[in-house]
Amino acid sequence: MNNGTLGAPPRVVVDAVTEHARRVAATYPPRVSWDDVKSSLAGLIGGDPEGFVFPRNTTEAMNFVANGLDLPDGAEVLSTDHEHIGGLEPWKLVTRRRALPLRTVSLPAPAASSEELLEAVWSGVTDRTRVVCVSHITFTTGTILPITELSARCAARDIVLAVDGAHPPGMIQMDLNTLGGDFYASSPHKWLLAPQGTGLLYIAEPWREKLWPTLASGGWDDMTLGAHRFNHMGTMDESRIAGLLAATEFFHALGMQRVEGRVRYLRGMLQDGLMHIPGLSLATPSDNALNAAMVSFRIDGVESLDLQAHLSRAAKVRTRVIGEYDYGWMRLSTHIYNSPGDVARVLELLDDAARNGVPARDGRP
């Protein structure tokens, strides 16, 4: 139940990757249609097909953004204390190199409303803020931030909004055409169940011509290519792109309304059960509009890393401990291949752990 880190690709995705790799090894390398991938992806998560770039993951995508902007002297970058290192470290690098301030605001956990989250982020904006970098859905608690409202405020102040969207594609219905923001970085290897090494970056107009490439190869300065000039990275393994196309087609066949309904149903079952476990406190909002398919919590008197090891040994349950920022929460994810039986079993294990404790993980006294 750690789909928030890595999804389990369906057979059609694995077959697409291996078949492409087999053909490359046997014959002249076949080409993957970039246009097909872009169109399929746009049909799934919205956006202009010409705005998509395919780096290896969210980390690389956000590095493209941070390194490609011409930030003026004295500019400030604003982020939060719920950002993944993959989305935040590029800004740490750029601001340290340029001797620019990187400001951080605290987000409530659990959050009570979208308005509370919006005002928490906006409280850090100053006259010098030039970039706001936040998550669409936080990796820490699964909280959904009000990106559309934040985008409107940023646009009114000529502030660049860079969104870490590692989780939403494949989890919830979304439309990049109406969501807002200047840049949207994601990792389809999570909820979209694409192969590892498939990332995406959506670049809104007019940034397709204004952003500097981080990797320069043939065509990097050909503005007629638009965002596609960022896909010119030299020789690359296109089998992962074949797998990404197969993954998007798989989700088209399922329908994102069905997918979101499934993951929300399982998460609701999980969260409702967690609320009845003694000594357990939730960091994920109770408002259904503020979360979708991840739940984070802590059990009094139980070390989350010990609990993680216990769940793995006892039932082969894979989890994620949020050790970043010293939060110490355990995070569980629910995806389409999980079942109500999976949820019931993990709730049983957690209830027993809360009442009886768990052994220390290996290597600890």
Where are each of the predicted segments found?
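Pyridoxal 5′-phosphate
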Residues: M1-P365
